[in-house]
């Protein structure tokens, strides 16, 4: 059972390979050297020997400042996280017999979610015998989608799932 963390970079004495393809501090390729020779070269210039491609044959190692390298990696990771946008799905529950004022309140909430960039799942739960009038629920969902068409697109048309009917709305991207 391996207990190596995903960020366990092989540096200096922790390098397991006997031979390494060595790259100098300014990026020039030095060639294939033994681990001992490579470590001596790194120590001469007061830098670390870091394996950058452990799966290559032989592994590729570079003479560099490990602290600086680690900092750059963390910086890149942070930038990648910033670029990722987490899309939340907000759900609004309606009933097929919803009154106009209640509908407008739910619509206002839905528009708020969509304007923030979240997807919106609008669902209608049919209770008892109301399931026999699915067309009423479908009209309510279509009305909701129609009221939001200026800020959202229908990602999934009204669909029945058990005793629920739902529609998915996604915000329109302004790029």
Curated annotation (Swiss-Prot):
User: A GO molecular-function term, please?
Assistant: translation initiation factor activity
Family label = Belongs to the IF-3 family.
Question: What Pfam families does the record point to?
Answer: IF3_C, IF3_N
Keywords, sorted A to Z: Cytoplasm, Initiation factor, Protein biosynthesis
User: Where in or outside the cell is it found?
Assistant: Cytoplasm
Record GO biological process = ribosome disassembly
According to UniProt, the name of this protein is Translation initiation factor IF-3
SUPFAM superfamilies, from UniProt? Answer: Translation initiation factor IF3, C-terminal domain, Translation initiation factor IF3, N-terminal domain
User: Lineage of the source organism?
Assistant: Bacteria, Bacillati, Bacillota, Bacilli, Bacillales
Q: Which InterPro entries match?
A: T_IF-3_C_sf, T_IF-3_N_sf, Translation_initiation_fac3_CS, Translation_initiation_fac_3, Translation_initiation_fac_3_C, Translation_initiation_fac_3_N
């Amino acid at each position: 059972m391996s207990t190596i963390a995903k960020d366990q970079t092989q540096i200096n004495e922790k390098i397991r390979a006997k031979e390494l393809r060595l790259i100098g501090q300014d990026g020039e390729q030095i060639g294939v050297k033994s681990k001992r020779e490579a470590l001596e070269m790194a120590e001469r210039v007061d830098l670390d020997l870091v394996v950058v491609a452990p799966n290559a044959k032989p592994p590729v190692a570079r003479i560099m400042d490990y602290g600086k390298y680690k900092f750059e990696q963390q910086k890149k990771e942070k930038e990648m996280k910033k670029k990722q946008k987490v899309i939340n799905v907000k759900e609004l529950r309606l009933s097929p017999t919803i009154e106009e004022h209640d509908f407008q309140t739910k619509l206002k909430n839905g528009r708020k979610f969509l304007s923030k960039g979240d997807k919106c799942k609008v669902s209608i739960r049919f209770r008892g015998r109301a399931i026999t009038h699915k067309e009423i629920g479908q009209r309510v969902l279509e009305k909701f989608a129609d009221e939001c068409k200026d800020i959202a697109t229908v990602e999934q048309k009204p669909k029945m799932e058990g005793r629920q009917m739902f529609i998915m709305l996604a915000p329109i991207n302004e790029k």
